Amino acid sequence: MKRIGGAILFLLLTFAIFGFLFLKAQAKWHTAEEAEFPRGPHITVYTDLPQGTVSLLLPSFRADTGICADVTEMTGAEMKETLRAGKRADVYLASQKVLMDLAETGAFASYTYGTEAVPADFKDEDGRWTGLFVNPVVFAVNRDFAEKNPNFIYSWNDVWQRKSVRIAMLDFHATEFSSDSLMCLVEHYGTEEAYRLLAEAAPHVVQYGEYLSMPAQMAAMDKCDIGISGYHEARRLQADNMPIRIMYPEEGTWCFLYGAALDAGAGNEAKAFFDWLFYKGASDKTLSENGFLFIPANAETPPLDDAGGNLYVWDLKKKYTESGKAELLGKWVRDVRFADNS
C-alpha cells in the first residue's frame, strides 16, 4: 500500500508540475501573440508604395495615437482588383493614377482636413485623395561632366538635342513610373512634338534601363553624362557619396506622386491616421534614415537643386486611359526605341 500511495503521490506531483509549466507557457504565448497582434483599435491599409515604406511609419503612429495599422502591400493593378472583389481597406496609400481611377468608382470619402498646405496640383479638387509624396524627374549629372561644362544649360531641349551628351533613361515599358513619364511628356508637349524630341534624343541614349535607379547609377559610374532619373533615386546615390549632381530642368518637369485616400466607409481611427500622415508622417525622419527620400507634397519649400535652382512642376491632369497608354507605348517602340533615328 505504501508503494501504491507513493506512486500516486508521484503522479500527482508530476501532473501538478506539468500543469504549472503548461499554464506558464500558455501565458507567455498569449503575451507574444498580443505583442505581434496587439489588441485595441485597428485599421487596414492598402499600399503600392515602395516595399517597406509605410511599415516604417507604424511604430511612430501607434506611439502617438494608440492605433494599430495592418498594411497590405500590392501593385496598383492588384489594388483595383481587390476593391472590385469587395475587399476594402480603411486607408489607401497609392500612386496618383491608381487613386484617380479608384476615386471615379466612388470608393473614397471626400476629406480635406489638414491638407491645406498641399498644392492644388497635388490633390483631387473634390477632396477624394491628397498627395503625400512627390518624386520629380530630374537630371542626375556626372560630377566630372558638370565640372567640365560649367555653362551647360540643363533644359530638356539642350539635353535631348545636344548630340555630344550621353544620356541614360528608363525604358518606358519598364515600370509604372516610366510609362507615366511618357504620358506626361505627351500631355505637356503634344504627341507629335514629344515623339520628335524623343527620336532626336535616341541616337545618343546609351542605355534604356529596366530599373528606376539605373539612369542615376550610369551617371555616377561615368557610363553616361546625364541620367534622366527620379529625385528619390538620385538622392539615394548622393547619400551614398556617389559622384553625381542633381539638377532640375530649367523649363520644368513632371513628377510621380503618391497620395492618400480614405475609404467611403472609413471610421475615426482611419481619419486619425490620415491626419497624422499630413501632420507628421510624410516628414518623419524614419523615412529618410532608411533611404526613402521623396519630397513631402506639403513641404513649405521644396529642396533646391545642386546649383541652387528651384523645382517647377508642370500642371498636368494625367487623365489617360490604359488603352491610350498602350497605344502610345506601342508608338514609342515603333517610332523611337527600335527605329533608325541616326
Predicted features and spans:
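Early extracytoplasmic/lumenal segment of secretory-pathway proteins
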Residues: 3-6, 22-105
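Extracellular/periplasmic bilobal clamshell ligand-binding domains
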Residues: 302-342
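Paired acidic/hydrophobic, glycine-rich loop segments that form the ligand-binding mouth/hinge
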Residues: 90-94, 225-230, 245-246
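Periplasmic-binding protein-like
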Residues: 117-122, 135, 167-173, 197-202, 208, 277-299, ...
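A bilobed periplasmic-binding-protein/Venus flytrap-type ligand-binding module shared by bacterial periplasmic
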Residues: 138-145, 255-269, 277, 285-289
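Hydrophobic membrane-insertion alpha-helices, especially the h-region
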Residues: 7-22
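Extracytoplasmic ligand-binding site segments that recognize negatively charged/polar headgroups
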Residues: 49, 83-84, 88-223
